[in-house]
């Protein structure tokens, strides 16, 4: 049986501050580092081994992966970093407090910006210092590839080619794969794997630092999926994510 593990990074400082993070390169909190280490312990206890790991180019995901691999004594395996696994870009909302934004625009509008499939937040200008076009890690990209804002549909459009061209072929070869990414880039992949509708994806929340395991058939179609760890803690973590955008 093929198993794929997805992991959202541990709590970041801007998760703690309840701010829209997007492509801003913020680090983990102490709690986030503990979450990452605990994820590694859970994976060890469940008997997982990995041959290759994929991660975004943002430090909160990279550091999470480091902690996981350290706990698993797998620091030596190949790691592929790619911008297509980045969090969705939150445009002009990036850096703003979610609750304060909800007070200004209303809970319903913020929920649409956070969780709808095809409604992006207001865009940045390219002159805005929050636009990542001058960041060296994106130097190989055309300016039009560096987003001014993104909805989940945009995130799906950039993530899935990397899945089909790079990750899925490795899984099909029998390699054990770990993907460490972000709430919305993982929502994009889960939407594809589970065939979730554009309407129902609004209700999907992925908690920080808890491994999500997919059991796949030979065609990489899901047979089942489940989170590792205590289910009460899982529910609390999911509910906390769901409540972040409320006034």
Curated annotation (Swiss-Prot):
Active-site residues, record numbering mapped to chain: 9, 87
Entry EC no(s): 5.4.2.11
GO molecular function: phosphoglycerate mutase activity
PROSITE patterns linked: PG_MUTASE (PS00175)
Pfam families xref list: His_Phos_1
Pathway: Carbohydrate degradation; glycolysis; pyruvate from D-glyceraldehyde 3-phosphate: step 3/5
Function of the molecule: Catalyzes the interconversion of 2-phosphoglycerate and 3-phosphoglycerate.
Protein name as it appears in the record: 2,3-bisphosphoglycerate-dependent phosphoglycerate mutase
Organism phylogeny: Bacteria, Pseudomonadati, Chlorobiota, Chlorobiia, Chlorobiales
């Amino acid at each position: 049986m093929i198993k794929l593990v997805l992991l959202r990074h541990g709590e970041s400082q801007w998760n703690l501050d309840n701010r829209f993070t997007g492509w801003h390169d913020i680090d983990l909190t102490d709690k986030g580092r503990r979450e990452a280490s605990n994820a590694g312990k859970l994976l060890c206890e469940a008997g997982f081994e990995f041959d290759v790991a994929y991660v975004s180019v943002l430090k909160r995901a990279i550091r999470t992966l480091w902690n996981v691999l350290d706990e698993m004594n797998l620091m030596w395996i190949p790691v592929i970093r790619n911008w297509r696994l980045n969090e969705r870009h939150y445009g002009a909302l990036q850096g703003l407090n979610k609750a304060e934004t909800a007070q200004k625009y209303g809970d319903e509008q913020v929920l649409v910006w956070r969780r709808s499939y095809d409604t992006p937040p207001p865009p940045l200008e390219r002159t805005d210092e929050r636009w990542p076009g001058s960041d060296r890690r994106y130097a190989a990209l055309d300016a039009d590839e560096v987003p001014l804002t993104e909805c989940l549909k945009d995130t799906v459009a950039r993530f899935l080619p990397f899945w089909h061209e790079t990750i899925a072929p490795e899984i099909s070869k029998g390699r054990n794969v770990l993907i460490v990414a972000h709430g919305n880039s993982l929502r994009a992949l889960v939407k594809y794997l589970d065939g979730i509708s554009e309407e129902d994806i609004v209700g999907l929340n992925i908690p920080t630092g808890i491994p999500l395991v997919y059991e796949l058939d030979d065609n990489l179609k899901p047979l089942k999926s489940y989170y590792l760890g205590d289910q009460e803690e899982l529910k609390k973590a999911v509910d906390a994510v769901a409540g972040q955008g409320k006034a």
